[in-house]
Amino acid sequence: ATVYNQDGTQVNVGGRVEVAL
């Protein structure tokens, strides 16, 4: 389950924020 933010980053269930390439 990954939630994508409007700025193109993604917040994983663990709380880590990653940049969607």
Curated annotation (Swiss-Prot):
Membrane-spanning segments: none
Keywords: Cell outer membrane, Disulfide bond, Ion transport, Membrane, Porin, Transmembrane, Transmembrane beta strand, Transport
Membrane topology field: Multi-pass membrane protein
GO cellular component terms, semicolon-separated: cell outer membrane; pore complex
Origin superkingdom: Bacteria
Keyword Membrane in annotation: yes
Family indicated by similarity: Belongs to the Gram-negative porin family.
Subunit organization: Disulfide bond interactions within and between MOMP molecules and other components form high molecular-weight oligomers.
Function: Structural rigidity of the outer membrane of elementary bodies and porin forming, permitting diffusion of solutes through the intracellular reticulate body membrane.
Name of the protein this chain belongs to: Major outer membrane protein
Organism listed in the record: Avibacterium avium
